[in-house]
Amino acid sequence: MSYEPKVSDFLALTKKEEILPKALTRLKTVSISTKDVISVKESESLCDIDLLVNVPLDKYRYVGVLGVVFTGEWLVPDFVKGGVTVSVIDKRLENSKECIIGTYRAAAKDRRFQFKLVPNYFVSVADAKRKPWQVHVRIQNLKIEAGWQPLALEVVSVAMVTNNVVVKGLREKVIAVNDPNVEGFEGVVDDFVDSVAAFKAIDSFRKKKKRIGGRDVNSNKYRYRPERYAGPDSLQYKEENGLQHHELESVPVFRSDVGRAHSDA
């Protein structure tokens, strides 16, 4: 039983991806690999599997496996007892519990079985060329001599290749701007910067009260702002406006409408 997958079974295109050219969307191309048949000869086996056959990798940076369909055909009579467990593994991960992408169990009496996995994650093209995926097949309670082939597996995958996998970054937000004007792009950049947690944390930290002279004071209160505070009362000393006591002296007054400094004795 051969399976001919449909892209729509694994991937739902947005309206933008359907209308816009490939260069303007994250989706670049979708390829269906040729089938790969695995003949199971032992009760337990672990073998590499190429999920990216005929997928063009050289022109892209990342590849994602959107879906994998396994079709199994038992090569024994349907009254035979026993079953099989098929697991797909990402061999890059060392933890045995975390490396399993998906597992399926089927009984020999079912004769044929089929299941679909949706890994839905990307790997770099450099990693993909090293074939990071494996299939672990374990036949249980099937009384058959060693060396015979009781099971055949056909594997078909749907993959997507792209040069950009960051979907929430500034680049994607800028591309999404419909009106190509400076103000629109500046607004997107400002909104993105304001949304980053690190910027918020720094801004909040700077606004906190600082300790001066052993007590909490607002540092903004003592910042020199001549245009706002210079005036008739500038020469009058007030204890609450100073950090230290000084004798009265001439104070330079800056006026923005004149453009130069004046001294009032």
UniProtKB/Swiss-Prot annotation:
Compartments it resides in: Host cytoplasm, Host cytoskeleton; Host cell junction, Host plasmodesma
GO term, biological process aspect, one: transport of virus in host, cell to cell
UniProt GO cellular component terms: host cell cytoplasm; host cell plasmodesma; host cytoskeleton
GO molecular function: RNA binding
Biased composition (Basic and acidic residues): 224-249
Entry keyword set: Host cell junction, Host cytoplasm, Host cytoskeleton, RNA-binding, Transport, Viral movement protein
Residue numbers spanned by region Disordered: 223-265
Keyword Lipoprotein: no
Function: Transports viral genome to neighboring plant cells directly through plasmosdesmata, without any budding. The movement protein allows efficient cell to cell propagation, by bypassing the host cell wall barrier. Forms a ribonucleoprotein complex with viral RNA. Binds microtubules and modulates microtubule stability. Can bind double-stranded DNA.
Record-stated family: Belongs to the tobamovirus movement protein family.
UniProt-recorded name of the protein: Movement protein
Originating organism: Youcai mosaic virus (YoMV)
